[in-house]
């Protein structure tokens, strides 16, 4: 999809840039959100083991650069898209975003982060959009409600 967007000058603006906080926490580290966000668990828990390989590498590069995991994850993402959508609920979240803008990962570091990645199946709302739906004029996810 990234190649198509680049060729057609379409901006990619991914949401959940830190995978519900998973890319900002070391394996085993938790937070209130990680413990209580049922929707994020639905999206990410099935792939936790394979994702931890990437999370460990994000932590390793954060240590090497003397910065946060948030900064490393967002710095990588900014090499792939035009505008990641990030949220901040605490002041230190903004610091990580600022650090990401200043951090430049080498091509080798970017490849190191990407190497263990395995594509995930779509879940949640995105999984409702099927290939068959692509033929219709509009695709809506409205539950039982008519639009």
Where are these regions (language model features)?
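Short Asp/Glu-rich motifs
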Residues: 23-25, 81, 96
């Amino acid at each position: 999809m990234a190649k198509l967007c680049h060729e057609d000058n379409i901006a990619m603006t991914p949401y959940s840039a830190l995978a519900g906080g998973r890319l900002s926490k070391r394996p085993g580290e938790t937070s209130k959100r990680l413990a209580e966000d049922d929707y994020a668990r639905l999206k990410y828990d099935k792939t936790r083991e394979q994702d931890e390989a990437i999370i460990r590498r994000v932590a390793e590069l954060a240590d090497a650069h003397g910065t946060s995991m948030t900064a490393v994850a967002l710095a990588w993402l900014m090499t792939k898209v035009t505008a990641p959508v990030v949220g901040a609920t605490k002041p230190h979240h903004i610091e990580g975003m600022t650090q990401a803008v200043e951090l430049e990962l080498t091509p080798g570091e970017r490849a190191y982060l990407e190497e263990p990645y395995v594509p995930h199946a779509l879940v949640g709302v995105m999984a409702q959009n099927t290939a068959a739906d692509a033929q219709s004029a509009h695709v809506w996810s409205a539950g039982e409600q008519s639009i």
